[in-house]
Design a protein with these regions (language model features):
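Polar low-complexity, Ser/Thr/Gly/Ala/Asp/Asn-rich disordered segments used for subunit assembly
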Residues: 1-96
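Extended basic-aromatic, gly/pro-enriched interface segments that bind polyanionic ligands
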Residues: 57, 66, 70, 76-171
Length: 171
């Protein structure tokens, strides 16, 4: 049985992180933290960069680990069109590895063809959740309605993107 790590002491100051990337143009940003303060700080920076004065649009990728109910609640608490969050269920891989794999695969393939759908692309290095912890089809559909991107498990316990969406839900 794998248990969650303990002993951490929160997320870093995202304002300091953002100040270190002055006017560099990053199309894809991997966000290893999904606490409200960190996501709001990054969201505000992305909105400023997206605006008419800078026009250096980008999207951030993050992940959320939790039960179906916890993941729905997290998704419904956000409304960010420049952040995409993939639900991990209870995968043994940590969320920062999910976010890195998700961002890396999306960035690579979208640079080749920005209109390419990302479904079925394998997330390298990611371990599948136990069968009892995997989201069912109807649960994954509800996650999408709550602004959470979904994954599927292919034969051999290979994890792949099922549907990539942003966390934007309400206009």
């Amino acid at each position: 049985t794998t248990v969650a790590m303990t002993g951490g002491s929160g997320a870093p100051d995202m304002a300091a992180v953002i100040s270190a990337m002055p006017d560099e143009w990053y199309n894809h940003i991997m966000m290893p933290f999904n606490d409200t303060t960190s996501l709001n700080t990054l969201r505000d920076e992305l909105l400023e960069r997206w605006g008419p004065l800078k026009m250096s649009e980008a999207i951030a990728y993050t992940a959320f680990r939790g039960t179906y109910g916890e993941t729905i609640t997290f998704g419904e608490g956000r409304n960010d069109f420049l952040i995409s969050c993939i639900g991990t269920s209870k995968s043994p891989s940590p969320i920062w590895e999910w976010a890195a794999s998700y961002c890396g695969i999306a960035a690579y393939h979208l640079a080749i063809d920005p209109a390419r759908p990302l479904q079925t692309l394998v997330l390298p290095g990611i371990l599948a959740p136990a069968k009892a912890d995997r989201f069912a089809f109807d649960e994954r559909n509800n996650l999408l309605k709550s602004g959470i991107a979904t994954h599927q498990i292919q034969p051999g316990d290979v994890v792949a993107i099922e549907r990539e969406i942003s966390m934007y839900q309400l206009n």
